[in-house]
Regions:
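N-terminal intrinsically disordered, low-complexity tails enriched in polar/charged
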Residues: 1-11, 284-293
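Conserved ATP-binding subdomain of kinase catalytic cores across diverse folds
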Residues: 2-113, 137-143, 158, 165
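C-terminal catalytic region of ATP-dependent kinase domains
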Residues: 38, 155-295
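Glycine-rich loops and low-complexity Gly/Arg-rich segments
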Residues: 49-50, 59-62, 89-94, 125-129, ...
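A general structural signal for short secondary-structure boundary/capping elements
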Residues: 71-72, 145-150, 206-213
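Short secondary-structure transition/capping segments
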Residues: 107-121, 190-194
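Conserved kinase catalytic-core segment
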Residues: 113-174
Length: 295
């Protein structure tokens, strides 16, 4: 996990956008963190989903902010009522204790972009990382669109960082099932045509994860983050990532769907074989991901 030393919130800065109503704080290590409370309105599995999702992405080499369990004290909550959760019935006091905290990427004058104009897509580095992220999200039962922010460097290039994993593993309450298209990035222009080498690398990366080590990683999480439904959904995710044939089927479905929707070139010259008539095979159906694609 991301660090072992305990840190705690020392300064409330502001509330942020989002269904989980996160807040921005300065922590005892001097850094800024986006904090999500355990009793957020989205569901009890959110801290688990955020932390384990970050760990899977890190294991795949996908960029994202570092995270840590962050202690929020009763005195901090009571002295900063602006951080309380807004509900239709009024303000709800956040629960104290260990919360999910991810390092804030917007400090030190960094220019961050959430939505890209059409002219900016050519400036994005690592387009293929979005394909790998989509594959991981499908295996993890992501029930929402993939979120990413883009950090602009001095030369104008944009580096993607993947954020907001709270809807992995069937969502913050668990058990939510959506079609596999629900988990892709909203603007399909980010998915550029893959070379055969990139195609193979994506499957190899996802299929090469040490799932035993990933499972052991949950031991470091706070006990109350590990709900029964979250653990069950996570076990299913690791099972999918261990099935090489299933991964191939999912990748074929992804490629077929984007080629159909975007009018991309057919796949024969790209991969040296015809796309399957029905990419979805029984193995994919068994994942209950509701993937459908007909070439």
């Amino acid at each position: 996990m991301s660090g072992k030393s305990l840190i705690f919130a020392v300064q409330y800065l502001r509330s942020l956008r989002g269904g989980s109503q996160p807040i921005l704080v300065r922590a005892s290590d001097g850094l800024l963190y986006v904090v999500k409370f355990t009793n957020n309105l989205q569901g009890p599995n959110l801290p688990f989903n955020e932390s384990i999702g970050s760990e899977i992405y890190r294991a795949c080499g996908l960029p994202g902010p570092r995270w840590k369990p962050l202690l929020v004290s009763d005195s901090f909550i009571d002295s900063n009522r602006d951080c309380w959760i807004q509900t239709p019935l009024g303000r709800l006091r956040p629960e104290s204790g260990l919360c999910f905290g991810s390092c804030f990427l917007g400090g030190q004058g960094n220019r961050l972009l959430e939505i890209l104009p059409a002219t900016s897509f050519r400036r994005v580095r690592n387009h293929d990382s979005f394909w790998l992220a989509w594959l991981i999200d499908i295996c993890a039962g992501h029930a929402d669109n993939r979120q990413a922010i883009f950090l602009e460097d001095g030369a104008g290039w944009l580096d993607p960082f993947f954020v907001d994993h709270g809807h992995l593993f069937g969502g913050p309450e668990g058990g939510l099932r959506r079609g596999f298209l629900a988990s892709r990035y909203l603007d399909p222009r980010i998915y550029q045509r893959l070379t055969s080498e990139q195609h193979l690398a994506i499957r190899k990366n996802a299929g090469g994860l040490d799932v035993d080590q990933l499972w052991k990683g949950i031991e470091a999480l706070p006990h109350d983050w590990k709900t029964t439904s979250a653990l069950s959904e996570y076990a299913e995710c690791l099972s999918r990532l261990s099935d090489s044939k299933l991964l191939q089927n999912i990748v074929d479905t992804m490629l077929c769907t984007l080629a159909r929707d975007n009018g991309l070139e057919r796949l024969e010259p790209q991969f040296g074989r015809k796309p399957p008539v029905a990419v979805l095979r029984p193995g994919v159906q068994a994942t209950k991901l509701d993937c459908r694609c007909v070439a």
